[in-house]
UniProtKB/Swiss-Prot annotation:
Organism name: Formosa agariphila (strain DSM 15362 / KCTC 12365 / LMG 23005 / KMM 3901 / M-2Alg 35-1)
Class in the EC hierarchy, top level: hydrolase
Top-level taxonomy: Bacteria, Pseudomonadati, Bacteroidota, Flavobacteriia, Flavobacteriales
GO biological process, one term: carbohydrate metabolic process
Designated name of the protein: Beta-glucuronidase
A GO cellular component annotation in the UniProt record: periplasmic space
Keywords: Glycosidase, Hydrolase, Magnesium, Metal-binding, Periplasm
Length: 981
C-alpha cells in the first residue's frame, strides 16, 4: 500500500510539473487608477489627514506638461523646447487593502518618475529617487493599515538640469536630450506576497535582485538554462521549501522543469540556482523572436506560496570587427532607430499608455527595423518587452546627458546603472549596455565593468560608450565602438555599431518642390534652418546616409537612424515646433521617409514611389522609387517610362523628366528578371468629404482615466481616396465622458490641445483621454464646404475597488511569424581593413584649452573636425589624405593662450594648420607658416591651409585661435601632419 501511494504521489507530482503554475499568494495590482493631483506645492501634503478633496482626479501615466509641449517653434541651435512649466507638484492616492492581507509583504513599484520623487506612506517618508528613467520601489508593509484607508503621497519636481548650473547634478533632465515632462509618467504597481517570496528586481532601496536567467551551451539540439532565484524569508521561523522552475514555450507548454529542496533560514535572503535543459530549442532571432518564459514557484508542503515569471530568449551572437553582427550563425545588418525614452506625443507629452508605446514599436517593425538605441536614458519596461517580442537588438543606457560626470552626478548615474542591469538583465533583446553618452575616466570605466560583472556575469553582453574615441585609453575598457554619424572607425580592433546617424530634418507637410509648400520656403525663420528639406528629399537621402555610412561596409554591424518620431528635443529648424528628424511625425503619421526605409529594410521585395501623383498640368519632374529589388520599371498610365537597373546608394531608382499625366503611376520591382512586387499611385479627384477613423487599444478604450483613443481626420475625394494636397482648418466638438487632447501642426506654435487643427498633406490625427466614467463619446468634425462627420466611441468600464484593480495595462499580442531572408542585397564593396589610430608623429602632446582634444590618424573626406560638434571635412585637398591630425573642441574658437597646443615632432614632417578665414590670423601662424592658397571646407566654412616643415625632435607650440573678438559661428583651427618624404 505504501508503495502504491508513493507511485501515485509521484505520478501526481509529474502531472503538476507539466502544468504551468499560475496561482499563488502573490497579487500584482495596477496602481495607476484614481490619484489626486495638484500643480502646486502645499505644505504638509504628505500628511495622512491632509484634505485633497479639491485636487484634480487623474490616473497614471500622467504628466502635467501635456498642455504646454509641442507648442513653441524650435530655437534651432540643437536646443529643445524649454518653455514648459517646471516646479514642485503633489500626487496622493487613497487605497485600502483587504484585512486578509495582514501578514503579507506589500511593495510599491514605480516604473519611473520625472524627475525627483519623494515618496510617503501614511505620512512616513520612504525615500527619494532622482533618476527619472529607472524603476524603483519601496517596502510599504511596516506602515500599512490593513482593512483601512492608506495614503500614498508623492512629491515630484521637474526643475531643469543643466551642465552649467553649479551643484545641479541631474544633467540629463534637460530639454536638449529629454524634455522635462514632469510627473508619474509611467506605470505604478502594488505587489502583495507571502513573507516567504521571490524578491523583486528593484535594487534601489530594496536591495533585491529577483531572478537571473541565462542560457549556455546553445545549439539547435539543446540549451542549458540556468535560473538564479533570490528567495527571502521574513517569517519568524526557518522554512523548508521546494523551488519549482518551469520553462514554458510560446504555446504555453512546459518544455523543461526542475524541483530543488532548500532550507531558507528566518530573516535571510538566499540565491538558489537551478539548471534545466531544453531539447531542440527555438532560438531568438531578429526575424523570429521566439520567447519562452520561466515560471519560478515556491512550494511549502506541496502548497504554492509564491510565483514569479521571467522572460527568456535563447540566442548566440557575435559582434565581429571584420564581418559585423551574427546571430545564431546568421550574418545580418542591424538597422533601426535611436528613440528618446520620453517617446513624447503631441497633445499627450511623455505620459502614454503602454499600447501607444506598442503602437510606435509596431510601426518600427513594419518599416523593417531590427535595432534600437535608447538615447540617452533607459526605455520603459513595456518598451523593453516590445524589443523582445518584435526582435529589436537593443543598445540600452542607464541615465546620461553628454558629459563625463563627477561627484554627485556620477554617483546617481552609477547607482542607476546598477539598478538598470538588475531590472532588465533577463531580456534577450538587450545586447549592449551603454555606459554613457560620452567617454568616461578609467576609474568610472572600472566601476561600470564591475557592475556588469556583479549583476550580469553570464549575459555575454558588450559594453560601450558613445564617443569613447574622445579618450585613447577607452579601448582598454569598451568592447564595442559606438559611433556617431557613421564617418569614422577609430578602433580597428573592436566591432562597431552606429548610435546616431542622419540628423537631418523635414516636416511631413512639405511634399516636394513641385507641390504647394505651405509658405515653408518663405517662412521668416527659414534662413535659420540647418535643414531646408522637403519630405521627398528627406526620404531619398535616407539611402545615402544608410548605405554610405554603414550599409555597404561589410565590417560594420549597422546602426540607428536618429530618430524615429518627431519630438520637442534638440531641433535645428526654427520653422518647426519639433525636431523633425523622425520617419513619423509627433502623432506617428508616417512621412515618405518611413516608406523609403521600409522599401530598403523589409526582407520581402518592396517598391515605393516617393511622393504623390497630383501635379499641375505641364509638370515634369524627377521621380524616385525606393526599392530593395535589383531593377525597377516605371509606368505612367501603363506606358513604360523607363527601366533602371543601376540604383544610387543601393536603393534609389531615379527617373528623370517624368511628365505628369492625370491617372496612374506604377512601379514594378524585379529580381533576377522576375517580377516581385508593384505599387501604384493615382491622381485623386477634388476634395469631397471629411473622413474620421478611430484607433483604440487592442482591448478597446478603457475608462481608467489615462487611456487614449486616436482619431484620424482625412480629406477624401468622391471615391474615398485621400487627397494628398488637401490642407486647411478643421473644427471639432466633443461630447461625453472624455478629455480632449487634440494634436498639433508641425509648423504652427500653440496648436496643441485646441478644438481645431489644420489638415497636413491630406490627414491629421487627434487624441482624447478617458476619464473614470465609462460611456459614449462623440467627436464631430467640421470644415467649410464639407458635410459634418462624426465618430462615436465607447469607453469600457474597468473593475476597480478601493483604489485597486488587477486589470493590467494593455498591449498588442504579437503573432509570431518567421520572416524570410532578403531576396536581394545590394553588392557591398570589398572589405577595407581597419588602420592604426595611434600617432607616431605627435610626441608628448598636450592641450591646455577647455574641453578635450584627441590625436587621430588616416585623415580623409568625411572625418569629424571637432570633439564637440558633428562637423565634418567636406572638401579636402588630396595631399591631406592619410594625415595624422588633432581634433580639438570648437568651443575654444575665441580662447587665447600662448601654449594651448604643444607637441614634439616625432619625425621630420609637414605641419598643416587649417584656419577659419573669418577669424583674425594669430601671430604664430603669420610668423611661422606659409599660406598654401588651398582651402578646406567644414560644413560651409572655408578654412585656409597653412604649411611649414618641422624637424624631428622640434618643439611645436601653437597659441589660441584669436586674442580678439571673433564671429559667433567661427571655427577653431585644426592641425594635420604628414611624414616628410
Amino acid at each position: 500500500m505504501t508503495i502504491l501511494c508513493s507511485c501515485a504521489q509521484q505520478q501526481q507530482q509529474q502531472q503538476q510539473d507539466t502544468e504551468v503554475i499560475t496561482s499563488s499568494e502573490r497579487t500584482t495590482y495596477n496602481f495607476n487608477v484614481d490619484w489626486k493631483f495638484i500643480k502646486s506645492n502645499p505644505k504638509q501634503a504628505q500628511d495622512i489627514n491632509y484634505n485633497d478633496a479639491t485636487w484634480e482626479t487623474i490616473s497614471c501615466p500622467h504628466t502635467f506638461n501635456d498642455v504646454d509641449t509641442f507648442d513653441d517653434l524650435s530655437h534651432g541651435h540643437h536646443d529643445g523646447e524649454d518653455n514648459q512649466w517646471r516646479g514642485t507638484v503633489w500626487y496622493r492616492k487613497h487605497f485600502k487593502l483587504p484585512k486578509d492581507d495582514k501578514g503579507k509583504k506589500v511593495f510599491i513599484e514605480f516604473e519611473s518618475v520625472r524627475q525627483i520623487a519623494d515618496v510617503y506612506i501614511n505620512g512616513v517618508h520612504l525615500g527619494q529617487n532622482q533618476t527619472g528613467f529607472i524603476p524603483f520601489g519601496f517596502d510599504l508593509t511596516p506602515h500599512l493599515k490593513f482593512g483601512e484607508e492608506n495614503i500614498i503621497a508623492v512629491k515630484v519636481n521637474n526643475d531643469r538640469g543643466d551642465h552649467f548650473r553649479e551643484n545641479f547634478p541631474l544633467v540629463w533632465n534637460h530639454e536638449h536630450w529629454h524634455p522635462t515632462h514632469g510627473g508619474i509618467y509611467r506605470n505604478v504597481f502594488l505587489h502583495t506576497m507571502d513573507p516567504l517570496h521571490i524578491t523583486l528586481p528593484l535594487y534601489d532601496n530594496l536591495e533585491t535582485v529577483g531572478t537571473y536567467v541565462y542560457a549556455e551551451n546553445i545549439s539547435e539540439k539543446s540549451a542549458d538554462i540556468t535560473v538564479e532565484t533570490e528567495i527571502q524569508n521574513e517569517h519568524a521561523e526557518n522554512k523548508n521549501i521546494t523551488l519549482v522552475t518551469q520553462i514554458v514555450d510560446n504555446d504555453g507548454a512546459v518544455v523543461a522543469h526542475s524541483n530543488k529542496n532548500v532550507a531558507i533560514p528566518s530573516g535571510q535572503k538566499m540565491k538558489v540556482t537551478t539548471v534545466t535543459n531544453i531539447q531542440n530549442p527555438q532560438l531568438w532571432y531578429t526575424r523570429y523572436p521566439y520567447m519562452y518564459k520561466v515560471v519560478s514557484a515556491i512550494k511549502e508542503s506541496n502548497k504554492v506560496i509564491d510565483t514569479y515569471e521571467s522572460p527568456l530568449g535563447i540566442r548566440n551572437f557575435d559582434f565581429n570587427k571584420d564581418s559585423g553582427f551574427w546571430i545564431n550563425g546568421e550574418q545580418i545588418k542591424l538597422h533601426g532607430w535611436g528613440q528618446k525614452p520620453t517617446n513624447a506625443w503631441a497633445g499627450l507629452g511623455a505620459a502614454l499608455p503602454d499600447w501607444l508605446r506598442d503602437f510606435t514599436f509596431k510601426l518600427m517593425d513594419e518599416a523593417g527595423g531590427n535595432f534600437i538605441r535608447w538615447g540617452h536614458c533607459a526605455a520603459s519596461p513595456a518598451e523593453v518587452d516590445m524589443g523582445d517580442k518584435y526582435g529589436f537588438v537593443t543598445l540600452m543606457p542607464g541615465v546620461s546627458g553628454e558629459s563625463e560626470d563627477e561627484g554627485e552626478t556620477w554617483d546617481i548615474r552609477y547607482k542607476a546603472f546598477k539598478d538598470l542591469i538588475v531590472y532588465y538583465r533577463n531580456h534577450p533583446s538587450i545586447f549592449i549596455w551603454e555606459g554613457g553618452n560620452w567617454a568616461e575616466s578609467e576609474a568610472h570605466y572600472k566601476e561600470i565593468l564591475e557592475a556588469i560583472k556583479t549583476f550580469d556575469p553570464k549575459g555575454k553582453r558588450l559594453m560601450g560608450n558613445r564617443r569613447a574615441d574622445v579618450k585613447n585609453d577607452s579601448e582598454g575598457y569598451v568592447s564595442i565602438e559606438i559611433g556617431t554619424e557613421g564617418w569614422e572607425r577609430e578602433y580597428p580592433d573592436l566591432p562597431i555599431i552606429e548610435s546616431e546617424y542622419n540628423r537631418e530634418e523635414a516636416p511631413r507637410r512639405i511634399w516636394d518642390k513641385n507641390s504647394p509648400d505651405d509658405n515653408f520656403y518663405n517662412h521668416p525663420n527659414i534662413s535659420k534652418n540647418t535643414y531646408k528639406l522637403s519630405s521627398e528629399e528627406f526620404a531619398v537621402r535616407q539611402a545615402d546616409h544608410w548605405w554610405n555610412k554603414m550599409g555597404k561596409k561589410a565590417y560594420h554591424s549597422g546602426g540607428a537612424n536618429w530618430i524615429f518620431s518627431d519630438g520637442p528635443h534638440g531641433g535645428r529648424c526654427p520653422t518647426e515646433v519639433t525636431r523633425a528628424s523622425g520617419e513619423v511625425d509627433a502623432v506617428r503619421l508616417p512621412k515618405e521617409a518611413f516608406y523609403a526605409l521600409k522599401a530598403m529594410w523589409r526582407p520581402e521585395p518592396q517598391v515605393h514611389i516617393v511622393g504623390h501623383w497630383n501635379y499641375e498640368v505641364g509638370t515634369k519632374k524627377t521621380m524616385y522609387v525606393m526599392s530593395n529589388c535589383a531593377s525597377v520599371k516605371l509606368y505612367v498610365n501603363d506606358k513604360l517610362v523607363g527601366t533602371n537597373s543601376n540604383p544610387e546608394n543601393g536603393y534609389v531608382f531615379k527617373f528623370d523628366n517624368v511628365a505628369w499625366e492625370s491617372g496612374k503611376i506604377k512601379a514594378e520591382g524585379f529580381i533576377d528578371d522576375a517580377l516581385k512586387t508593384t505599387q501604384t499611385k493615382e491622381t485623386t479627384g477634388e476634395p469631397a468629404a471629411l473622413k474620421l477613423t478611430s484607433i483604440t487599444g487592442p482591448e478597446g478604450w478603457l475608462a481608467d482615466g489615462s487611456d487614449v483613443a486616436l482619431i484620424d481626420v482625412e480629406v477624401v475625394d468622391a471615391q474615398g481616396r485621400r487627397c494628398p494636397l488637401a490642407k486647411g482648418r478643421v473644427d471639432f466638438t466633443i461630447s461625453g465622458p472624455a478629455i480632449w487632447r487634440g494634436g498639433y501642426n508641425s509648423g504652427k506654435p500653440n496648436s496643441t490641445n485646441n478644438l481645431f487643427l489644420d489638415i497636413e498633406a491630406g490627414i491629421n490625427r487627434v487624441a482624447v483621454r478617458s476619464v473614470l466614467e465609462s460611456g459614449t463619446v462623440t467627436i464631430m468634425a467640421k470644415k467649410p464646404g464639407f458635410k459634418d462627420v462624426s465618430v462615436t466611441l465607447k469607453s469600457l468600464p474597468i473593475d476597480f475597488n478601493n483604489g485597486l484593480t488587477t486589470t493590467l495595462p494593455q498591449v498588442y499580442t504579437n503573432v509570431l511569424t518567421k520572416e524570410p531572408l532578403p531576396e536581394h542585397i545590394p553588392e557591398m564593396p570589398e572589405y577595407i581593413p581597419g588602420v592604426k589610430n595611434r600617432s607616431e608623429l605627435f610626441r608628448k602632446f598636450s592641450y591646455t584649452g577647455d574641453g578635450k582634444a584627441m590625436l587621430r590618424t588616416n585623415m580623409h573626406w568625411g572625418k569629424k573636425a571637432y570633439t564637440d560638434l558633428e562637423y565634418n571635412y567636406t572638401v579636402l585637398p588630396r595631399y591631406l589624405n592619410e594625415s595624422e591630425y588633432v581634433r580639438t573642441p570648437n568651443s575654444d574658437n575665441r580662447y587665447w593662450a600662448r601654449d594651448q597646443l604643444q607637441f614634439i615632432a616625432g619625425k621630420k614632417m609637414h605641419i598643416y594648420v587649417l584656419h577659419d578665414d573669418t577669424v583674425p590670423r594669430p601671430e604664430f601662424l603669420l610668423r611661422d607658416y606659409e599660406d598654401t592658397g588651398d582651402n578646406v571646407n567644414v560644413v560651409g566654412a572655408s578654412m585656409s591651409v597653412f604649411h611649414r616643415v618641422a624637424e624631428e625632435g622640434e618643439s611645436i607650440i601653437m597659441a589660441g585661435n584669436s586674442d580678439g573678438d571673433a564671429p559667433e559661428n567661427c571655427r577653431m583651427y585644426t592641425v594635420m601632419v604628414k611624414e616628410f618624404k
